[in-house]
Amino acid sequence: MPEPAKSAPAPKKGSKKAVTKTQKKGDKKRKKSRKESYSIYVYKVLKQVHPDTGISSKAMGIMNSFVNDIFERIAGEASRLAHYNKRSTITSREIQTAVRSLLPGELAKHAVSEGTKAVTKYTSSK
């Protein structure tokens, strides 16, 4: 019975570089498709909060799944809110309301204040 193919080890500390595969002579080199992830951003936040702490690739994978899950929940809720109010555009207001409804108490307050700060910084830089 043939053994299942083993996958390549996960890249360390949020690297997103393209990896090239080498094949037989005469064949062209084929680049691996880029895997998008939030790992570089998770790593940056980790270093802001705990500069001397590292993170394993397994833990980084869990954090990436978590961020993707929260993103999908917020986007879905914001989409529903826009639809209920007969709007075709998701604005920062829909995102803010979605965050308030999805996240509990103090966490929602912090998320809203950080989001407002980010939007203000973005609009002032334009």
Swiss-Prot record:
The keyword RNA-binding is assigned to this record: no
Cross-link (Glycyl lysine isopeptide (Lys-Gly) (interchain with G-Cter in ubiquitin)): 121
Modified residues (N6-acetyllysine): 6, 13, 16, 21
Residue span of region Disordered: 1-36
Any one GO molecular-function label of the UniProt entry: protein heterodimerization activity
InterPro entries associated with the record: Histone-fold, Histone_H2A/H2B/H3, Histone_H2B, HISTONE_H2B_site
PTM: Monoubiquitination of Lys-121 by the RNF20/40 complex gives a specific tag for epigenetic transcriptional activation and is also prerequisite for histone H3 'Lys-4' and 'Lys-79' methylation. Phosphorylated on Ser-15 during apoptosis; which facilitates apoptotic chromatin condensation.
UniProt subunit comment: The nucleosome is a histone octamer containing two molecules each of H2A, H2B, H3 and H4 assembled in one H3-H4 heterotetramer and two H2A-H2B heterodimers. The octamer wraps approximately 147 bp of DNA.
Name assigned to this protein: Histone H2B
